[in-house]
């Protein structure tokens, strides 16, 4: 790549190039918008009418508790639970009776268990003991029951042997039964075996489940139609937000000014929409989409293109946080720096306009500085040849992975609670933030370490673990996969122990972890977004659901 294209970048420096592919979307999201709501007041009226019908179904008193549990679960899985948060909480509190399960079959017990644990209610896994035979083994051949049991096992915490047995039992049975199943159950099972619901991006899970539920003979027509209309209405909002972000990206002309970096504004929006899709979080989504865009540019500059001297100058400029500092960094970096300052200034103005104050913008700036410092350390690893210990690498990578930053910035953008106390607590990297960050790092490194080594990088969780503990590459990768499961159990545990302050961090921690699970399930789906990532973005942001 010609250094001359990048302004004052030195032409005699041997620079690396990751050869990232261009955007797969071109200007599509700059011009594309849904016409679903155009001049169609009847759709809005129908949506409101159906919402009331579904609410009535949810709150009506009934002695048929299995049906009420199933309905509550379907509302959530169809992606419309955010309309009924108060009603769902009330229903779950009623269902949180430890004796109720004595009358449930295994299918209902599994759904009940997953629902309650998934919403922070403490339920013992002992509820599954009565479904084991005299030999201590589970007994069922029913595919739907096995599917529900398998989904429930992913809410397990450390030490729950019965759920470890249940996941092995149900997975083995489902894999054997899958070829014999018909639609829609076969797709439900296939999706769960690929990515269980608890670990899936909730918006993507809803997109998958809507046509599956629509094909069920026992479906509720009003609920099915409501889910379709609501999905399309939300999609129209998300398209408008992405169009605005694409316009900002285009105005700065990042792709042509920084051709070594990933051009991934749509993928970044998909990431942030996966973390919080609800309309009330529009401001947070817009801000975080720009943040992930600018952070990605900085990451690529430090990882791939910049010299150690150049990135050190940029780090110093970030510490100053002053437009005057732009004069002290290489010309090619200046567009990143001015873009960065502009994002935070715009966010501050929007917070003041929306809420009357800037809602702890200083926390946002500090956590951004922190991630740049972590990038600096990683650049020093590469340029000096320094190999950190495994613990030293992981301590820095918890920050460089970005999840602490994204969680704190999401909290500021959402602004739903006593923010300063929550931010003080979240800034200490509590257990749930640490678990989320570690899962992200293990997943990321497993999928990217070989590509990074082709660029000359030798520091990763895999390589540091191999070096320190004297194990093979295969053994190190196996250990990383085991650690992902351990940290998921720890993350699950923290959701059950959450107090008033930490409960506000539960959903961001879970959702960012879910996005990473999905984005990297078939490789680095952010850097290489030409395959399944493109398909998923199209499903969520391009193709409406047929009514």
Curated annotation (Swiss-Prot):
Q: How is the cofactor bound?
A: Binds 3 Mg(2+) ions per subunit.
Print the keywords alphabetically: Lyase, Magnesium, Metal-binding
Binding-site list for Mg(2+) 2: 299, 303
Q: Where is this motif: DDXXD motif?
A: 299-303
Q: Which cofactor does it need?
A: Mg(2+)
The record ties this protein, via PANTHER family, to: (-)-GERMACRENE D SYNTHASE-LIKE ISOFORM X2, OS04G0344100 PROTEIN-RELATED
Instruction: Give the domain note.
Output: The Asp-Asp-Xaa-Xaa-Asp/Glu (DDXXD/E) motif is important for the catalytic activity, presumably through binding to Mg(2+).
Q: Can you name this protein?
A: Delta-guaiene synthase 1
State the species of origin: Aquilaria crassna
């Amino acid at each position: 790549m010609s250094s001359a294209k990048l302004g004052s970048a030195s032409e005699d420096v041997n620079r690396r190039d990751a050869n990232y592919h261009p955007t797969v979307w071109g200007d599509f999201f700059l011009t594309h918008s849904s016409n679903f709501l155009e001049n169609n007041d009847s759709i809005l009226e129908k949506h409101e009418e159906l919402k009331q019908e579904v609410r009535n179904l949810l709150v009506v008193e009934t002695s048929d508790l299995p049906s009420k549990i199933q309905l509550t679960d379907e509302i959530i899985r169809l992606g419309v639970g955010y309309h009924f948060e108060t009603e769902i909480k009330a229903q779950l509190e009623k269902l949180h009776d430890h004796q109720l399960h004595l009358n449930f079959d295994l299918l209902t017990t599994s759904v009940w268990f997953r629902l309650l644990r998934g919403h922070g209610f403490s339920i013992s896994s002992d509820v599954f003991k009565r479904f084991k035979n005299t030999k201590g083994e589970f007994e069922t051949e029913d595919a739907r029951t096995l599917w529900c049991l398998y989904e429930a096992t992913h809410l397990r915490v450390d030490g729950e042997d019965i759920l470890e047995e249940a996941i092995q039992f149900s997975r083995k049975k489902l894999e054997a039964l899958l070829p014999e199943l018909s639609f829609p159950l076969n797709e439900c099972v296939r999706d769960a075996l690929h990515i269980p619901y608890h670990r899936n991006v909730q918006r993507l899970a809803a997109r998958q489940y809507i046509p599956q539920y629509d094909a069920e003979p026992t479906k509720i027509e009003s609920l099915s139609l409501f889910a379709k209309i609501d999905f399309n209405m939300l999609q129209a909002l998300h398209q408008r937000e992405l169009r605005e972000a694409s316009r900002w990206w285009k105005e700065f002309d990042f792709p042509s000014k920084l051709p070594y970096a990933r051009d991934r504004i749509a993928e970044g929006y998909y990431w942030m929409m996966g973390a919080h899709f609800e309309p009330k979080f529009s401001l947070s989504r817009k801000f975080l989409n720009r943040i992930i865009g600018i952070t990605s540019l900085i990451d690529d500059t430090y990882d791939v293109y910049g010299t150690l001297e150049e990135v050190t100058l940029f780090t110093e400029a970030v510490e100053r946080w002053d437009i005057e500092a732009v004069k002290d960094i290489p010309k090619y970096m200046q567009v990143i720096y001015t873009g960065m300052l502009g994002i935070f200034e715009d966010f501050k103005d929007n917070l003041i306009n929306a809420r009357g104050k800037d809602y702890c913008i200083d926390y946002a700036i500090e956590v951004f500085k922190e991630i740049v410092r972590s990038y600096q350390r990683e650049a020093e690893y590469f340029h000096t040849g320094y190999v950190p210990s495994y613990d030293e690498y992981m301590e820095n990578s918890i920050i460089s992975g970005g999840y602490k930053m994204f969680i704190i910035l999401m909290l500021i953008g959402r602004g739903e609670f006593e923010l300063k106390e929550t931010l003080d607590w979240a800034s200490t990297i509590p257990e749930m933030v640490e678990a989320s960050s570690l899962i992200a790092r293990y997943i990321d490194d497993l999928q990217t370490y070989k590509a990074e080594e082709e660029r000359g990088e030798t520091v990763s969780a895999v390589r540091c673990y191999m070096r320190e503990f004297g194990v093979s590459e295969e053994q190190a990768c196996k250990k990383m996969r085991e650690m992902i499961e351990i940290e998921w159990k720890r993350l699950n545990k923290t959701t059950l122990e959450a107090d008033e302050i930490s409960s506000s961090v539960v959903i961001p921690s879970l959702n960012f972890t879910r996005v990473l699970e999905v984005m990297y399930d078939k490789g680095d789906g952010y850097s290489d977004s030409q395959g399944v990532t493109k398909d998923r973005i199209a499903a969520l942001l391009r193709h409406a659901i047929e009514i």
